[in-house]
């Protein structure tokens, strides 16, 4: 058992020792979290044997061995043993089932219920000690309360005290859950039903009931409205004179909790299901589910109950994280955010437990492992750094191997009799490419970590091991070469490593570009020129352009002019779509003026089109009347149609209004130059306050259609005094 398992076991022991009737046993077995992703439920992995048609148990075990995460096969096996009353086989099956599912509430509830059915209370208490504080599920904790009440009759004084302690234990742990309402109600009913043999005992009882009521009505739970009515009736039954005072004091927090309950109910409705607990599906529905879980956590972090960053707020946020970890444990973001949150509240122990648990559920997740390793290294704890990276590398290699196996099986399933190329669907090809890159980056991270903690010599040994690995990309060679250059200050070794990588990645543009840049940086012109001439024929022209440009820049700035001209002519042949002038200008970091002018012309045309629409169809700004009052702008018009057009622009600044007061003295539209009209300051200020376009996820609005609709709409004209000031005031109110 590793360190965080010991910590969790100790915490479980302390709480359960304080809870009634459950004593922690020294030899109690705890959940072995290293078996979370067990690859098999049997020790042997021999050839699959043929089963008889009536051998249902054997068939189910074969299915489980093929896919340990097949929860339906597990439950079919449980049902088979349960229907035949085979207690030991049933118990063994549940224990095997807990290896891949150590935190699934349903499994623990069913396992404990089966032991209760056989009246094995000792086994039940051991199971509760293993799971209770690790699995924060209302169903599991309700079962715990039922067990406590079952073994403690209400009539005895000590039993009542034990049950009271159990209820306090439960509501302190999961009382923030919106589904915990029935537990609060049961606790209140239990307290109110208790005997009181003296005035002092009666007062103690009333105070206890009041305290639980007041906690319940400030918690967003489903039955909060009923509890509020019950609390009101309770206070009035005790003392009408003080009832109004108590109720008035709690009314504001109750209203806030009720509003929060409604929001939380919408957020969590249908959320806690097992559809995404056992296997990643990489579907849109799964992404939506993950997003909903994140929305719940963000909602709790927004502090809707105005708890002011206290312990209660931290408990609520932590509980939301715990629920997400139970139901969507294969979502890496949950573990990363949980780790960051617990660190932010200075709870490093819980943060480490969270990220270690996440690494077991997501063994091939790059970010989780690197984040953990860097945290440990930053805190001078280096014992687990190497093993963390090595486990990540092994997990990524397994995933890549599984994808290769899929490709092999698809090629073998060819029906035309011809050997078929190993081929994966496009989305799996992309996934494999991403995994291979992460695999290489994991080696790079390990090399750097070992160099920092053990020295360059140890890092070289890691590189030697990495370049012999079955899956690799060019990043490994780049990382090792640059380490030698910067840390050993030996460009010769770095160049040798780069050259070694050329054997495998000489046709990879990114690798050649990096190698060429390095040779230029160390002023090795001879080898740089040789590399360029050797690599260019092996790379497709469309991918080689950055390499051409890099060498052209070097020749233009530091080489021979004739060589630069010759290379420019060579590029003109390779890239006929590029103009000779554009290639020439690129030597000086400039762009083709013709292309720039074309772009600027298009932008100016767009501005002119906008100004035409803003001016009601006329392509020029008219004469401006500068009257003292903003709303006393007189506009001479010769037709009712022009009056309507003027009304459409009435609230714009005068610089955009068409003034036609001079009648025939004004030149015709075609006689005036069409120039871009600057937007009014009030509009530019408004545009500055709008969010960036990339954050808008809703339907897009077509601006031109919107302007057309506004222009064509029959909007009644309202003359306002100081219209500009009115508009500004309306925006800020």
Curated annotation (Swiss-Prot):
Compositionally biased spans, kind Polar residues:
27-45
Keywords (alphabetical) are: Cytoplasm, mRNA processing, Nucleus, Repeat
**Annotated spans, Disordered:** 1-45, 404-425
Gene Ontology biological process: co-transcriptional mRNA 3'-end processing, cleavage and polyadenylation pathway; RNA 3'-end processing
What cellular component GO annotations does this protein have?
Answer: chromatin; cytoplasm; mRNA cleavage stimulating factor complex; nucleus
Check the record and name the Gene3D superfamilies matching this protein: 1.25.40.1040
State a single Pfam family of this protein: Suf
Q: What is its main location?
A: nucleus
Q: Which domain of life is it from?
A: Eukaryota
Cellular compartment(s): Nucleus; Cytoplasm
HAT repeats: which residues?
85-117, 119-150, 158-193, 204-237, 269-302, 312-344, 523-557
Bias regions of kind Low complexity — which residues? 404-414
Any single GO molecular-function term of the entry would be:
mRNA binding
| Purpose of the protein | Component of the cleavage factor IA (CFIA) complex, which is involved in the endonucleolytic cleavage during polyadenylation-dependent pre-mRNA 3'-end formation.
Q: What is this protein called?
A: mRNA 3'-end-processing protein rna14
Organism, by scientific name, is Schizosaccharomyces pombe (strain 972 / ATCC 24843)
């Amino acid at each position: 058992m590793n360190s965080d398992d010991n910590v969790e076991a100790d915490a479980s022991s302390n709480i359960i020792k304080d809870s009634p009737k459950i004593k922690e046993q020294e030899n109690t077995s705890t959940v072995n979290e290293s078996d979370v992703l067990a690859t098999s439920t049997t020790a042997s992995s021999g050839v699959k044997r043929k089963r008889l048609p009536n051998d249902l148990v054997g068939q189910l075990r074969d299915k489980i061995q093929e896919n340990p995460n097949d929860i339906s096969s597990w439950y079919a096996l449980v049902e088979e043993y349960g229907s035949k009353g085979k207690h030991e086989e049933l118990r063994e099956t549940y224990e095997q089932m807990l290896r891949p599912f150590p935190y699934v509430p349903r499994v623990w509830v069913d396992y404990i219920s089966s032991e209760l059915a056989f009246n094995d209370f000792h086994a039940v208490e051991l199971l509760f000690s293993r799971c209770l504080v690790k699995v924060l599920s209302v169903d599991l904790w309700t079962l715990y309360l039922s067990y406590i009440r079952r073994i403690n009759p209400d009539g005895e004084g000590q039993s009542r005290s034990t049950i009271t302690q159990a209820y306090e234990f439960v509501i302190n742990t999961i009382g923030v859950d919106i589904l915990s309402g029935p537990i609060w109600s049961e606790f209140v009913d239990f307290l109110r039903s208790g005997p009181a043999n003296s005035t002092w005992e009666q007062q103690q009882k009333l105070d206890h009931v009041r305290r639980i009521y007041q906690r319940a009505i400030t918690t967003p739970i489903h039955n909060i409205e009923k509890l509020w009515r019950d609390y009101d009736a309770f206070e009035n039954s005790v003392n009408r004179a003080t009832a109004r005072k108590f109720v008035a004091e709690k009314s504001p927090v109750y209203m806030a909790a009720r509003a929060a309950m409604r929001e939380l109910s919408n957020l969590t409705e249908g959320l806690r299901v097992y559809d995404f607990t056992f296997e990643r599906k990489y579907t849109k529905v799964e992404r939506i589910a993950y997003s909903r879980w994140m929305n719940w956590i963000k909602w709790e972090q927004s502090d809707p109950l105005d708890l002011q960053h206290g312990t209660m707020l931290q408990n609520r946020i932590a509980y939301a994280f715990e629920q997400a970890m139970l139901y969507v444990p294969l979502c890496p973001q949950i573990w990363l955010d949980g780790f960051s949150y617990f660190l932010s509240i200075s709870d490093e122990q819980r943060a480490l437990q969270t990220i270690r648990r996440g690494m077991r559920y997501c063994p091939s997740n790059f970010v989780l492992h690197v984040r953990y390793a860097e945290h440990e290294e930053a805190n001078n704890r280096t014992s687990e750094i190497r093993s963390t990276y090595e486990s990540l590398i092994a997990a990524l290699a397994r995933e890549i191997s599984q994808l290769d196996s899929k490709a092999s099986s698809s090629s073998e399933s060819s029906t035309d009799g011809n050997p078929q190329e190993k081929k994966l669907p496009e989305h799996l090809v992309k996934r494999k490419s991403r995994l291979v890159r992460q695999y290489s980056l994991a080696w790079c991270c390990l090399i750097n970590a070992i160099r920092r903690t053990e020295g360059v010599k140890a890092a070289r040994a890691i590189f030697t091991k990495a370049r012999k690995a079955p899956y690799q990309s060019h990043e490994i060679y780049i990382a090792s070469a640059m380490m030698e250059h910067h840390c050993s200050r030996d460009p010769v070794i770095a160049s040798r490593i780069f050259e070694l990588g050329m054997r495998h990645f000489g046709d990879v543009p990114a690798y050649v570009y990096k190698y060429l840049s390095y040779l230029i940086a160390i002023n090795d012109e001879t080898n740089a020129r040789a590399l360029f001439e050797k690599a260019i024929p092996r790379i497709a022209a469309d991918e080689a352009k950055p390499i051409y440009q890099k060498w052209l820049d070097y020749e233009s700035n530091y080489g021979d002019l004739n060589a630069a001209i010759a290379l420019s002519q060579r590029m003109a042949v390779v890239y006929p779509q590029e103009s000779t002038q554009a290639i020439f200008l690129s030597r000086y970091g400039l762009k083709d003026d013709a292309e720039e002018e074309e772009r600027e012309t298009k932008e100016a045309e767009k501005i002119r089109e906008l100004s035409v629409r803003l001016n009601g169809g006329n392509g020029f700004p008219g004469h401006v009347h500068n009257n003292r009052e903003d709303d006393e702008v007189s506009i001479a018009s010769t037709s009712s149609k022009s009056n309507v057009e003027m009304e459409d622009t009435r609230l714009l600044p005068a610089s955009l209004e068409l003034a036609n007061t001079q009648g025939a003295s004004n030149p015709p539209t075609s006689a005036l130059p069409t120039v871009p009209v600057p937007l009014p300051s009030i509009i530019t200020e408004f545009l500055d306050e709008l969010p960036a376009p990339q954050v808008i996820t809703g339907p897009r609005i077509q601006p031109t259609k919107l302007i057309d609709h506004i222009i064509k709409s029959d909007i009644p004209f309202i003359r306002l005094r100081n219209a500009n000031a009115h508009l500004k005031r309306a925006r800020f109110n």
